[in-house]
Regions:
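N-terminal metal-binding scaffold of metallo-dependent hydrolase/deaminase domains
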Residues: 1-39
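Divalent metal-coordination and catalytic microenvironments
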Residues: 8, 22, 27, 49, ...
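Divalent metal-dependent hydrolysis catalytic cores, especially in the metallo-beta-lactamase
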Residues: 62, 78-107, 121-134, 160-171
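Generic structural signal for well-ordered alpha-helices
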Residues: 81, 108-112, 153
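Conserved phosphate-binding/catalytic loop of the ribokinase/pfkB sugar-kinase fold
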Residues: 133-160
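N-terminal active-site wall of soluble small-molecule enzyme domains
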Residues: 172-177
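Conserved small/polar residues in nucleotide/adenosyl-binding loops
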Residues: 178-185
């Protein structure tokens, strides 16, 4: 279905545009034009002078709407995602605080299930921990130093593609090996 949004302030890479329109089909922007002439066959939506902006990418989001991604349940993921979508996020990288490897395993299972859904907003996980310096972890509630175990993290990275970012402290034993180039890094994980 073709939708045309008119009568709004449109944010483009060149700046703000007034008196234009945005054409959308199947949830994707087809065109931004400086004309607000009606497109035949399109459903017209009047923005009533409001701002029209691209969807937001949420890259460091721990939860929302009363839900926390670290709960590692489908209910928590759905609830937090819905809260952020309501406010304009179209792409989400759930951030999971992982004081132990078991939390990562649970988060990966939920994330992989949600990523299987066509046109879903989740594009991968952002993991914080367990290889963080407790003195530098701010409000992350990491209470002990966990040396990075190559067997542990390589096994996780070899079985999933959903981890896109994994935070660690380089001063923790084993973390420099953990961040060295590997085949997994080339598949999309930022360490």
């Amino acid at each position: 279905m073709l939708t045309q949004i008119i009568n709004g302030h449109i944010l483009t890479p060149q700046g703000w545009m007034k008196d234009g329109s945005v054409l959308i089909s199947d949830g994707k922007i087809l065109e931004v034009t400086n004309s607000d002439l009606a497109v035949i066959g399109a459903k017209v939506v009047d923005a009533k002078g409001m701002s029209i902006v691209p969807g937001f990418v949420a890259m460091n989001i721990h939860g929302g709407g009363g839900f926390d991604f670290s709960e590692c349940t489908e209910e928590a993921f759905h609830g937090a995602v819905a809260a952020h979508q309501k406010h304009g996020a179209t792409t989400i990288f759930p951030t999971v605080l992982a004081p132990e490897i078991g939390v990562i395993d649970k988060a990966v299972a939920v994330c992989e299930e949600m990523m299987r859904k066509k046109d879903g907003p989740i594009l991968g996980l952002h993991i914080e921990g367990p290889y963080l310096n407790p003195k530098m972890a701010a409000s992350l509630f990491i209470d002990k130093e966990n040396p990075a175990d190559p067997k542990e993290y390589k096994e996780i990275l070899e079985r999933t593609d959903c981890i896109k970012r994994w935070d660690s402290s380089p001063e923790i034993p084993g973390c420099l090996l953990y961040t060295s180039p590997s085949p997994r890094d080339q598949r999309g994980t930022r360490m």
